[in-house]
Amino acid sequence: MASQDSDEALPANYKDYPDGSLLRVVFHNFLTYEHTSFLPTASLNMILGHNGSGKSSIICGICLACGGSPKSLGRSERIVEYIRHGCTEGYVEIAIADKQKGPQVVRLTIRVGEQPKYRLNDSATTQSEIADLRKHYNIQIDNPCAFLAQDKVKSFSEQSSIELLRNTEKAASADLDQQHIDLMKQREDSTSIEDKCTTSENAIKRLEDEIGKIMPLVENYRKKLALQSKLRLLEKKMKIMEFEKFDREYKAELQNMDGAMIEYREVEKSIAECEKHRKNLEDRIKKDRSQISQMQRSCNEILAKVQEKGDKKLMEDMMQRAKAKLESAKKAADQHEKDVEKARKMIDQARARLQEAVDTLNGYEEFQSEMKSLEQKYSTAERDSRQEEDAIQKKSYEMRQLENKKRDEEQNSQLNRQDRYRVLQNFSSDASKAYRWYQQNRSQFKGDVYMPIMDMVLKTPEAAKALENSVGVRDRTMFVCCYKEDELLINGKQHSWRINTSVVPAEKIYSEDIDAQLPSELSRLGFKYLVSNCFDAPAPLKQFLCNVSGLNRIPFGGSDVEKKIAEVSQAIEQTRYSVFLTANIRCQNSKSRYANNTLQSQSATREANTWRDQFFKVSPVAKRTDNSILEEIQKLKAEIDIRSEQLREKRGAIQKERDVLRQEQMQWKSKKQVHTKWKTELASEMAKLEALENEVVDISAIEEEYANVEKKAILETKKMLENSIRWHKEIIDKHRLIGIFELSESICKSRVNKSNSEAETHRSKLEDLKSVKDAAEDLLKTALNHKKAAASALMKECSLKTLDESKMSPAENKIYSSLVKMFEEADVPTDMNTLDQAITSEKTRLKLAEDSGEDGSIVHEQRLKVLDDDLVLEKTRQEKLIENRARIHDKLGDEINNWRKEVETMIEQINVNYVQFFDSLGCRGEVSLEVPENPLDIEKYGIMIMVCFRKGESMKRLDNKVQSGGERSVATMLYLLALQQLCPVPFRCIDEINQGMDPTNERKVFDIMVGMWNGTTGTLSKTQYFLLSPKLLHGLDMRENVNIVMVNSTLTNSHGKHYDTSAKIDATFAKMGISA
């Protein structure tokens, strides 16, 4: 490199340089340069120098002076590190050609501890202003197609097709690159719409999936609601029919009671009338007796007077009395005959009625006997029912006890798991997160997943310490799976946690490991058990611990072992066991690798830390045997339901039989009452007849007496006629009255007897009616209680106080009308038996629905409504998004098509040059636009380079895994050359692109480059080129426009003065066969 005397020097023909070309480059304390100046030519500048001479420093200085970033150089990203070693300040200065304004001088000054400073034409400026200046001249230092630093050559050849397209656009057309950027922004907007559409589709799918999952629960819930609604409707109808039934029964019993009361009152009235009539007759008898006594006294007085006056009156009186007596006897005899005849007729009538009643009582005794046996049977059945109720209550108590026990065990198990989980959280947050996720997604796993901390149950007091000194810390949170699929599921790449997992399949579980017992010889030495015996765990987990920690081969001993530790160690050495534990010591025997002897190590046991809590001694899961509690509870519940239903049906059947029996009893009782009535009537009439028959009226004796009296009276009358004629009439009258009174008294007495007999008959009848009335009252009370219970049930079920519409309130009328309409619409049975069967059937269907396992609720119903509403809203939103997406895609597709046409035109021009260059090498190559599957994915468009360096082979895509480094360098260089005609940049820099090329290809590429720059047309004839290389081939076609710059590194300034650069170059060119 020639050194200039002045940093202000410019090339002699600098005015001919195209705008943006570099006229001068000055380095001061920059990288390898202390101070130097470099004047490039306007065409090809080949900068040659051995490795480490400072060739790449020129590229770095040009890039930084043009406002570039250190990141684009592939070296240090700290700009202060570009200062020469040992210095605190340095600068780079470049002069840019400009025919109108003159050379534009840009200086970048770098100082340690300060920000870099830029100056333009000796005036302070900013990096952004320098970037604007760079854009003005179209200097593309950030485009590897125009500016390819040494450390970026490899990355350029390895860049993707997408990156190659972007860089090609930057080099060929800023407008095309900006259009690509704008399209990518539009694509991001459309992608956002597509993401929203995808999100909406996923949301719709999620909503539909959730609706699909919840629909069976809602349908089952609706089915149960329908069944419950129908069951309630049937039960309402049953309550109404029961109320109507009991109301009818009550009215019938009330009518029977009224009939019994009427008959009872009539009999009471008859008795009162009889008593009143008897009293009146007795008063009449008393009155008649008083009159008779008075008349008799009067007659006696007259008789006394007659006697005093003469015997005639006495005779007359005697005749009169005899005559009256005769007449009275005749009348009484006539009446007696009539009464006897009447009594006989009444007796015949009573006998006929009694016989009819007797006939109706056929079977009464059998009924009574059957009734007694049935009552005994019903009593026995009721006693059995009460015993069954007691048994059911006992079973219910047992079931509640089991439920309480199960609930307590579940609570204890839950608390145990929570305590263990807290220990796990303190141990490892990732393991706790993974375990919680496993618990929440357990249904996705093929088998169970176990963990020592969560699933081990300690059995002995020393178990915690034994495990602390036997199980590794890493293994304590190990997830032990039964299937490989479960391990991939819990420890897949989709999770953020880092956990330890292992798989122990069922076929790898060996009972001789997990069930190993302490050998008798070790027991004699004082060992208590193997460590694997001090805890319980699921078989896969226990097998895992036996595999990794050898717990089935570690015996645990007490203080006896510690006392004779040497003897025990010697005995252990003879067995297959190498490790044993005591409460305070851990011993291990191992074979020496260098001598055939046993090495023994002892260490103090660590205190229990992980398993020190008491809850590790309790199983976190209910015992297997206790799992039967749920089955027993379900069994007891089913048995209670069945036995309760059977008891209800049994009692219902007995009650129905009792109701039928009571109705039959009432019929028989009515018949019995009729029989009793006529039996009493017959007895009364027969008593009357007997009394009448006992009353004998002897008329003949009275007639004879009368004749004697008459004879005597005639005889005496003749003697006393004159003396007694005056009083005779008076006496006769009085005796007539006396006879009347006596006859009246006799008749009254007879009537009193009759009245007494009738009263007794009525009293007997009243007693019978009283029992009937009492029975009717009991039945009425029973019917009333049934009616009240039915009314209460009616009010509770139907909100109705009565079924009489005239007595209903408007609200009740509305309810009743609604119920009637619902009954008609639901075709509810009107027969109680049919209705009862329907209720039983609906209860069975409801029970089946409740036991189906798909138990829904109002929460699911509400959730379904929310999901349906969300689904409608989401579908509406999706339709709008799809419309927007279609509109945006149409617009974007048109703009992409327009951009694509320009890009394809550009690539076709590149391809023409690229094919031509490869033909000159005797190889094949082509460039094409790589179009993504979705033409709208503008960010996925790229440039695909296909090459073939050997005959007979097909072209393959340029790739760092297929072609060699030299082949990639050739393909990359030719692509850059093919791109030059489309890239109007003022200068280009390529650093060591020929590294890895074979000499033949390197020579051909160089010839192509020289041929292109020797032309007089096209952009290359006006482009400045910097090509850096550590070597130069012999026999290259060097033209006049090729500027060779040699870079040498010197140790001191004086050494440089003695270095004859021109002579060195001439000698080198002569050796290479190049004319200078």
UniProtKB/Swiss-Prot annotation:
Its main location: nucleus. One of its GO terms (biological process) is meiotic DNA double-strand break processing involved in reciprocal meiotic recombination. The keyword Coiled coil applies. Expressed in the germline (at protein level). Residues 190-415, 627-713, 749-786 form a coiled coil. InterPro entries: P-loop_NTPase, RecF/RecN/SMC_N. Residues 375-410 have a biased composition (Basic and acidic residues). One of its GO terms (cellular component) is Smc5-Smc6 complex. The keyword Amino-acid biosynthesis does not apply. Residues 416-617 are annotated as: Flexible hinge. Signal peptide: none annotated. Interacts with smc-6. Core component of the smc-5/smc-6 complex. Functions in DNA double strand break repair by promoting sister-chromatid homologous recombination during meiosis. Acts in a DNA repair pathway for removal of ionizing radiation- and ultraviolet (UV) radiation-induced DNA lesions that is distinct from classical nucleotide excision repair and the translesion synthesis pathway. Also involved in the recovery of stalled replication forks. This is Structural maintenance of chromosomes protein 5. It comes from Caenorhabditis elegans.
